[in-house]
């Protein structure tokens, strides 16, 4: 992929130098020495841990502010959560990372066939903003599949799945939420795998804690890819090159 790099002067305009100066003042410095250690008395430890809440609560708003400034520079719009797909979607996927590009291509393909599907892209994972997530979910959504690129053995679910499950419980009539895993060991999913996720959501009893991109013939948790899902745009030329090497003995 081709990228356009922002100039250092443009990035410098995004930096709050006053806040940076205040942050650097907290560094250890012989000019204004302080004592710091790894131990803290139990009478105040818990209270000090909770006193950090405000700083974390403020982060999503700060991130949104600077994402707005990036939009002014680049023309690309970013938020803590971004939605892609049908405005009246009844099934959506929530995920983060490079898989979102594959999901977007699959959404375009399925929408051309009349399906009401969508995607929420997680851009700020921690701290997690429940309010911003809920504002991003279309009111028409009935089912959600959360995709995690990790496996938590022994847990009832993977991290993002559990966060989404907790968040949607604040909705009066929450949609059904299921979770799945993908991409471990570079087993990257194809559009046919993503289409299988949406098909699984469409069923009356969708499989939970599923996997895509592999064939699980041991615990049978994998979803079978949908055949003949072609997301190639019109006018695309695809070429396959094969290299053959022979070693000739003398």
Regions found by a protein language model. Give the residues of each.
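Redox- and metal-dependent alpha/beta enzyme cores, enriched for Fe-S-associated oxidoreductases
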Residues: 87-115, 128-135
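Conformationally flexible catalytic loops at phosphate/diphosphate-handling active centers
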Residues: 1-82
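Terminal amphipathic helices with adjacent charged low-complexity linkers/tails
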Residues: 2-33, 135-173
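Short helix-loop-beta junction
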Residues: 65, 73, 105-119, 170
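Glycine-/acidic-rich phosphate or pyrophosphate-binding loops and their flanking alpha/beta elements
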Residues: 68-91, 104, 224-238
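Peripheral docking tails and interdomain loops at the edges
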Residues: 143-233
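Conserved phosphate/anionic-ligand binding catalytic regions in large, soluble enzymes, centered on
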Residues: 239-250
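Buried hydrophobic positions in well-ordered alpha/beta secondary-structure cores of metabolic enzymes
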Residues: 93, 121, 144, 164, ...
């Amino acid at each position: 992929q081709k990228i356009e790099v922002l100039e250092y002067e443009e990035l410098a305009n995004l930096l709050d130098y006053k806040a940076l100066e205040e942050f650097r003042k907290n560094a250890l410095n012989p000019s204004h020495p302080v004592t710091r250690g790894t131990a803290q008395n139990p009478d105040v430890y818990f209270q000090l841990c909770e006193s950090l809440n405000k700083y974390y609560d403020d982060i999503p708003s700060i991130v949104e502010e600077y994402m707005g400034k990036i939009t002014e520079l680049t023309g690309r719009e970013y938020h803590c959560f971004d939605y892609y797909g049908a405005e009246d979607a009844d099934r959506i996927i929530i995920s983060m990372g490079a898989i979102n590009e594959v999901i977007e291509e699959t959404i375009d393909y399925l929408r051309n066939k009349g399906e009401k599907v969508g995607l929420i892209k997680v851009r700020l994972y921690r701290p997690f903003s429940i309010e911003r997530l809920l504002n991003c979910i279309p009111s028409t959504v009935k089912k959600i599949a959360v995709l995690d690129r990790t496996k938590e053995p022994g847990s009832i679910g993977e991290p993002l799945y559990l966060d989404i499950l907790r968040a949607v419980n604040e909705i009066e009539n929450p949609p059904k939420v299921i979770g799945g895993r993908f991409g471990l060991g570079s087993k990257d999913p194809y559009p046919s795998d993503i289409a299988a996720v949406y098909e699984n959501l469409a069923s009356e009893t969708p499989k939970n804690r599923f996997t895509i991109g592999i064939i699980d013939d041991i615990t049978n948790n994998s979803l079978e890819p949908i055949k003949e899902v072609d997301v190639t745009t019109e006018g695309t030329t695809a070429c396959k090159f094969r290299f053959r090497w022979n070693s000739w003995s003398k």
